[in-house]
Amino acid sequence: MRMLAVILALLVPSVADAAEINALISTALKAATDELLPPFERAHGHTIRASYGPSGALIPRFNAGQPADVFLTDSAAIDELIKEGKVVPGRTDLARTGIGIAVRKGAPKPDVSSPEALKQALLAARSLGHAAPAGGSITAPHIMRMFEQLGIAAEMAPKVRLAAGGPNGRVSVLISSGEADIGLQQVSELMSNPDVEVIGMLSAELQQITIYSAAVTTNAREVEAAKTLIKALSAPSAAPIYKAKGLDPP
């Protein structure tokens, strides 16, 4: 019995080893991390204080003093933070995703298989939802340029409904509520709403692929715990969960 107690003591993390990890995480990774973080906490005894937001909104929050041991955001933002000396060099790529097209579940599914087909579908829609540029979205500027590329910017302007961000301000909510007939957003975010159906992806000519990465901040208080978290999130065992949430291997 004494030997068993010793073995169990070695296997179970001690309170002294437990850490509170502050993590800033892009919304595109929320559905996946909602599943990945709890098992990590149970296995290691750590607590994750996760704070989510659009990629472009996370950095201002960090610069304003919000604590962060680890950043999970788009690779371009991580690279910029490394240049500024705010993140430790050597990012770990976790997954990638692209912009999907979605409608309310049960609604007619227009053809969006080519740039011309998408153009006609957008022109036929009464309203369209995408993220608000002012909210820090990295997809919004690309979508607006795409409208220009398709030659429909003027026609789309009065139809656009902007998602401000947050739990009730997502593109998927605009679609599921009926406020937007069709929506454009990173597919991992669209798939998180069961009342929304993804009907396709932007074609290669129009697509924007974003790689999401993780890195430890230079002012991290829990460096080793943050490294352990990144290792867990990039493990092969995490790949099926990313895939199920609309995220592919990097």
Regions from the language model: what does each represent?
Residues M1-R2, A18-E20:
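Absolute protein N-terminus
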